Amino acid sequence: MRKSMKSLIFPDVNVWLALNYEKHAHNPFAVKWYDALPQSTAFVFCRHTQLGLFRLLSTEAVLKQDTMSQAQCWAIYDQWIDSGHAFVAHEPPGLEAGMRTRASGASATPKLWADAYLAAFAEAGNLTLVTFDRALAREVKGAIHLV
């Protein structure tokens, strides 16, 4: 994880989608929030959020006639990276321990895996998680719940 004086913002997959797809129901909220951030704010992708964004942008059931090609997905991602407003973070030390703490229950909860990963990544990396998911926001100290 690079060190800097920048605020490190870690959007979940749905926030990334809303920032990059104008027809997303939460796009106006996401863009208003984004526009109010200081110029020095840095956005963080992890491999999970990168692939999740690509998957949603290229899924017809999500974007209907606006479904994007792989090349278009890469172009959106490259704009973030090339602009210097975002970077890809490697998995921070302590991630797996944090994930195990959150996802070691006796019940089968398939939807918990990704949330546990994102929460643990944010905490281990000292990142500010941003999400539309109220329950996920409650799991991470300092998380931002949009909407």
Segments and roles (model prediction):
Residues 141-147:
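Active-site regions of enzymes building and remodeling cell-envelope glycoconjugates
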Residues 15, 49, 94, 135-136:
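Alpha-helix capping/helix-boundary segments
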Residues 1-10, 14-45, 60-72:
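Short, well-structured N-terminal submotif of metal-dependent ribonuclease cores
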Residues 42, 98-100, 144:
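A generic "structured core" feature
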Residues 45-52, 72, 114:
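Short, conserved alpha-helical segments within structured domains
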Residues 20, 57, 140-141:
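Short, flexible helix/strand-to-coil boundary loops that buttress conserved ligand/catalytic motifs
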Residues 18, 54-55, 78, 82:
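Generic alpha-helical structural context detector
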Residues 83-134:
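Active-site neighborhoods of divalent-metal-dependent phosphate/nucleic-acid chemistry enzymes
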